[in-house]
Amino acid sequence: MAFELPPLPYEKNALEPHISAETLEYHHDKHHNTYVVNLNNLIPGTEFEGKSLEEIVKSSSGGIFNNAAQVWNHTFYWNCLSPNGGGQPTGALADAINAAFGSFDKFKEEFTKTSVGTFGSGWGWLVKKADGSLALASTIGAGNPLTSGDTPLLTCDVWEHAYYIDYRNLRPKYVEAFWNLVNWDFVAKNFAA
C-alpha cells in the first residue's frame, strides 16, 4: 500500500496574507510530497510494509521514521490551519487550557516561546498527556509526540521551509501570524478523542 500526498484542506491562497500560496506550493507540493515519495521508496521489503502511518511513526527509526513522521506531522499541521481560524477555543478545550496554563493568553505566550525557541528545524506542540493533562512540547527534526505516548492537539511547523518565503529569518513573526489561522475546531476534536 503506497502512501499518497493528501490534498490541502483549502485552496493554496486561502491562508493569505498570513501564509502565501507560494509558500504552500513549495511546502506542500514539494517538501511534503518528497517525504511521501521517500517513505514509499524506503518501505518495500521491510517490517513496515502494510502498516499504517501512525504505526510506522510509533515503531520505526532512522530514515523510515524521519520520512513517516514528516508525512504525519505535515498532514496534521495543514489541518491545524484554517482560513476561518484564529480567535480562541471554547468549551472543554478552553477550560483545559485555562486549567493548565492559567489563561488563554498565558498559553499563547508559552506556546509561542516553545515554538520560537525550538533549536533548528522542528515543531512546537500542544499535547494531551496520558492522564488527560495538557502540556507543551518541542521536537527537533521529524520528532513526533506519538512516540512518547502523548496525543498531539496542535502543532506549529518551525522548519525554515514553513516560513522563509514569507518571513525570511523572522520565525517570531511567522508564529505570530500562525495564531490568525489556528483551526480550533480541529484542535477540539483532537482533545475530545
From Swiss-Prot:
Destroys superoxide anion radicals which are normally produced within the cells and which are toxic to biological systems. Partially complements double sodA-sodB deletions in E.coli. Binds 1 Fe cation per subunit. InterPro entries: Mn/Fe_SOD, Mn/Fe_SOD_BS, Mn/Fe_SOD_C, Mn/Fe_SOD_N, Mn/Fe_SOD_N_sf, SOD_C_sf. Its EC number is 1.15.1.1. It holds the Pfam family Sod_Fe_C. Belongs to the iron/manganese superoxide dismutase family. The keyword Iron applies. The gene is sodB. It is an enzyme of class 1 (oxidoreductase). Homodimer. It catalyses: 2 superoxide + 2 H(+) = H2O2 + O2. Fe cation binds at residues 27, 74, 157, 161. Its cofactor is Fe cation. The keyword Oxidoreductase applies. This is Superoxide dismutase [Fe]. Disulfide bonds: none annotated. GO terms for molecular function: metal ion binding; superoxide dismutase activity. Induction: By growth in a high-phosphate succinate medium (at protein level). Strongly induced by growth on medium containing FeSO(4) (at protein level).
